A protein has these predicted regions:
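Aromatic- and glycine-rich beta-strand/loop motifs that create alpha-glucan
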Residues: 1-23
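Selective transmembrane-helix segments that form parts of the transport pathway or gating/packing helices
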Residues: 17, 73, 77, 102-132, ...
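Hydrophobic alpha-helical transmembrane segments of multi-pass membrane transport/permease proteins
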Residues: 17-41, 68-76, 181-185
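Terminal transmembrane helical anchor/hairpin motif
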Residues: 36-60, 178-247
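Long, hydrophobic alpha-helical segments
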Residues: 61-87
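Helix-loop-helix units of permease transmembrane domains in multi-pass membrane transporters
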Residues: 84-114
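Membrane-interfacial helix-loop-helix connectors in multipass membrane proteins
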Residues: 128-151, 211
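Hydrophobic alpha-helical transmembrane segments of polytopic membrane proteins
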Residues: 146-171, 228-233
Length: 247
């Protein structure tokens, strides 16, 4: 049933021009950054070749694309997640969905997986661009995989927060603004912290991605994203459960 809900949401997302416009915009930005970094690498290649231990294609070209993607997704995910529940609440179809023979958990997971599927497609496009470099150079596949995993987990966290905010209102625009504000707060929460071990650093979304961007997959960073995703999915379930009880 989760799969059926996810496929339905996937079709609805792609039925609107927004998903296509967003994907086209993402690919345009990613391609521009990719080609810009590739041009920089080609200009620096003589110096790189003469320097032992110099950074390679992955560090100079691929990693910056993933870094740029974090900022772009911060702005884009609120637009994709805003209608997941808010639109159904506004059009008054949410009571019909909740009265169907499916659990609230299945509804929430289905909607989340549909959005995550689109974000995974965006991450896959970046990976495909970076893999094209293997035709003319050598890539650090471990570093590439760590960046891709980190970006996917970060995008999943964005999606979970966006889904929860969409559960709170009947206005998609309000959900989008609220999601962006919440994500930005979690992004910048450590800006005033001086101690790397402080709670503000631990709670920062981008702080954990930086570990992945260096090629390290640490259990604490995996755990952070998975716990954050699970927390906001649980909050979404609790919110819709409360709505079902009131209905």
């Amino acid at each position: 049933m989760i799969r059926a809900i996810a496929l339905k949401e996937w079709r609805l997302l792609f039925a609107s021009p927004l998903a296509w416009v967003v994907l086209a915009f993402l690919q345009l930005v990613f391609a521009w950054v990719f080609l810009s970094r590739l041009n920089t690498f080609l200009e620096l290649q003589p110096q790189i070749a003469a320097t032992p231990g110099a950074p390679g294609l992955t560090e100079i070209v691929a990693a910056p694309v993933f870094g740029t993607a974090t900022i772009i997704l911060l702005m884009v995910v609120p637009l994709l997640s805003m209608r997941l529940v808010a639109e159904e609440r506004r059009s008054q179809t949410l009571p019909f969905l909740m009265s169907a023979p499916v659990s609230i958990t299945q509804i929430v997971l289905g909607k989340f997986l549909a959005l995550l599927g689109i974000l995974a497609l965006a991450v896959g496009l970046i990976v495909a661009m970076c893999l094209s470099l293997t035709f003319g150079g050598r890539l650090d596949l471990g570093l590439l995989a760590a960046n891709a995993l980190g970006l996917l987990l970060l995008a999943g966290s964005f999606a979970a927060v966006g889904l929860y905010l969409s559960c709170l209102t009947a206005q998609p625009l309000v959900a989008a603004v609220g999601t962006f504000a919440a994500l930005l707060a979690l992004w910048l929460i450590n800006i005033s912290a001086t101690d790397p071990g402080s709670l503000l650093h631990v709670l920062s979304l981008i702080q954990h991605f930086e570990t992945f961007s260096k090629g390290t997959v640490a259990l604490k960073d995996l755990g952070y994203y998975l716990v954050l995703i699970a927390l906001f999915l649980l909050l979404s379930i609790r919110r819709l459960d409360a709505d079902r009880l009131r209905a």
